[in-house]
């Protein structure tokens, strides 16, 4: 109703993707399933689930390869080369979003692989301790991708309409917000989410 799409997650438990894609399907495809950087066979399986949901785009949080809890896990996860990413982009058969970009070099690699968009994100600081804030690296990444057609999204502590304004001013095309929406859902259900959206819109308009 408000033009906001959900980014859903993935995990070592297969039910995470199953429930996420089920929810996206129930919402008429208004969601972006995010796949971890597993091995290619697992990615194919997850991608099939994602596409079956009718989603309008698919994402991969490539930085998740560095998450401590994924080490020595099954299925295995790991970093992806430009060539591997390009293969995954083709599998998606719809706009593909590379999440977890924190450098100009990474942004240009995503573009080379055929990504339609990137998410400037440090995974909440859980991949690399004491890494830069997304606001610190966003301007140079935005400058590097200017005129390429690649959309730039950003996350990282965005809570208010003023935060959204700052992100847009620094070069983002859009933002990702997580925790406040979770709080709104647990505190007030659907009505809580509506109230938070109204609050965001009002702050941004002001």
Segments the model singles out, each with a brief description of its role:
Residues 9, 120, 177:
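Short beta-strand and adjacent tight-turn residues that come in two discontinuous sequence segments
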Residues 75-78, 132-138:
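Charged helix-capping and loop-helix junction motifs
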Residues 1-113, 124-127:
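Active-site entrance/lid segments in N-terminal catalytic domains of soluble metabolic enzymes
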Residues 107-110, 115, 167, 172:
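Small-residue (primarily alanine) positions within well-ordered alpha-helices
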Residues 28-46, 128-132, 145-155, 201-206:
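Short, basic, helix/turn surface patches
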Residues 136-206:
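Alpha/beta catalytic cores of nucleotide-metabolism and tRNA/nucleoside-modifying enzymes
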Residues 60, 118, 167:
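Terminal peptide-recognition signature
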